[in-house]
Amino acid sequence: MIKVVKGDITKFRAEAIVNAANKYLEHGGGVAYAIAKAAAGDVREYIRISKEAMREQLGKDWIDHGEVVVTPPLQLEKNGVKYVIHTVGPYCGGSWDEDKKSKLKLAILGALKKADELGVKSIAFPAISAGIYGCPLEKVVETFVEVVKEFLPSAKSLREVFLVLYSQEDYEKALKIVGQGGV
């Protein structure tokens, strides 16, 4: 089930939440900063934890499209969050093409696969790359729905996938694509 929700992803109750990170996990702005601040209180501390996890899990200092890094939820655990899954979407700067769509699909799919591997039943995503990375929200939502619909039938544990949008305007745009009751 895919459902669009208006709200703050840092307060959302799901077993895993996805962070739309940059490839160095620096959490300098947008949803990445908000998640880091909510998780650790001190963003620099969450950056340190994230970079350490990246070196342990990937053996390098950056994430490619499709790769993910998992960090503990720390203070987000009070919302039922067990994992924060960091993924990197494409930078669009207002444009959109097949290459950007392909990179976004990899980012979404990587997070879905990791969540399923971890045995979670619910996951919340922000609109990856639609914020400061400048990808058109409608294209991001369409791609998100396409990837999730392809993935869910084969999922072992994952049952609920939420797209959490902060602004009313973004929520309404996404709702037009996904529909009131979800997919």
From Swiss-Prot:
Coiled coil: none annotated. PROSITE patterns: MACRO. It holds the Pfam family Macro. Residues 1-182 form the Macro domain. Transmembrane segments: none annotated. NCBIfam families: PRK00431.1-3 (NF001662). This is Uncharacterized protein PF1536. It comes from Pyrococcus furiosus (strain ATCC 43587 / DSM 3638 / JCM 8422 / Vc1).
